[in-house]
Amino acid sequence: MASVSLRKLDKSYGALRIVKGIDLEINDGEFVVFVGPSGCGKSTTLRMVAGLESITGGEVKIGDRVVNQLPPRERDIAMVFQDYALYPHKTVRENMGFSLKVRGVSASQANASIDEAAKMLGIEHLLDRRPGQLSGGQRQRVAMGRAIVRRPQVFLFDEPLSNLDAKLRGQVRTEIKRLHQQLGTTIIYVTHDQVEAMTLADRIVILRGGDIEQVGTPDEVYNRPESVFVGGFVGAPAMNFARARVNGDRLAFSDGNSLPMAAIRPSRETGLEGRDVIVGIRPEHFGPAEGFDSQLAVSVQVVEPLGSDTLVHFSLGDAALTARMPPQLRPTPNEELRIGVDPSKVHLFDATTERSIH
């Protein structure tokens, strides 16, 4: 196991700067997930750690070694890819043990490592099969087993679940988390899926346009987003946003609705009077009007019953918002509805910078 340090890490292709001076410390044994939209630099950063991509500037340190100039085989890392990268003509056992064979590990020692990893992943019965005889989920487990037998200091996962269907993604995601609990090895994991990030990570690194937008635990990035981007990216359905103005002790929306400032966390900040802000409210922080002192009068647009709850889409001024409501609440489209809000859960962001007002 080892810590990983990224210092002023930079990557450019000609005049195009992809990764913009990232600073990040990953602790020994930590599970860190890089998440963000396509083109944000997450996979490029991972590939620089792996040695598969040259570094334009800055430093990558694994343990106590600066590895900028080291080839991948000398970095003591193991990588799991999206497309499995298995040899089709080799058995599962041969695929899992190939790197050990190249390193000159004895057959008995290699087989012991393979058997241990296969048992951990529940694929002992597949060891004599070839990749063409396996399902997608089984192939991904083999790819993970191939990484495990190397006993690296750091595991690198590059969108390993993208080729799997929703059910398999959930199963393999659980196995990856259990694997980390058993091995305790440092993991850097790249995904575009915020659900994977929230369920797997000790800490999440949210990237945007080659910069780090926020680093924090799943709880921190969900409940204390530092920007509109983070608030809207993390959570499903996404955080709702609407523009408002601070008028005295009220947060006033353009359609005449308002909320009390006293219960909103940033209200103790000075200089908010008359200020335009972006209001962020998560769907689950709405509720039936009778359960809340603070209420909004809204017009229902669309209703989506989900069994366990109901998603109610409505307009608030010029904004379209979504509320997660109890399953028994079934308003009709175009109905005028009073909806409750928990003001202590309301987030305020600067209308210009879109950064959180703490």
Curated annotation (Swiss-Prot):
Location in the cell: Cell inner membrane
InterPro entries: AAA+_ATPase, ABC_transporter-like_ATP-bd, ABC_transporter-like_CS, ABC_transpr_MalK-like, ABC_transpr_MalK/UgpC-like, Mo/tungstate-bd_C_term_dom, NA-bd_OB-fold, OB_MalK-like
Entry keyword set: ATP-binding, Cell inner membrane, Cell membrane, Membrane, Nucleotide-binding, Sugar transport, Translocase, Transport
Record Pfam families: ABC_tran, OB_MalK, TOBE
Broad enzyme group: translocase
UniProt-listed Gene3D superfamilies: 2.40.50.100, Nucleic acid-binding proteins, P-loop containing nucleotide triphosphate hydrolases
Keyword set includes Cytoplasm: no
Chief place of localization: membrane
Binding-site list for ATP: G36, P37, S38, G39, C40, G41, K42, S43
Subunit structure: The complex is probably composed of two ATP-binding proteins (SmoE), two transmembrane proteins (SmoG and SmoH) and a solute-binding protein (SmoF).
Protein name: Sulfoquinovosyl glycerol transport ATP-binding protein SmoE
Taxonomic lineage: Bacteria, Pseudomonadati, Pseudomonadota, Alphaproteobacteria, Hyphomicrobiales
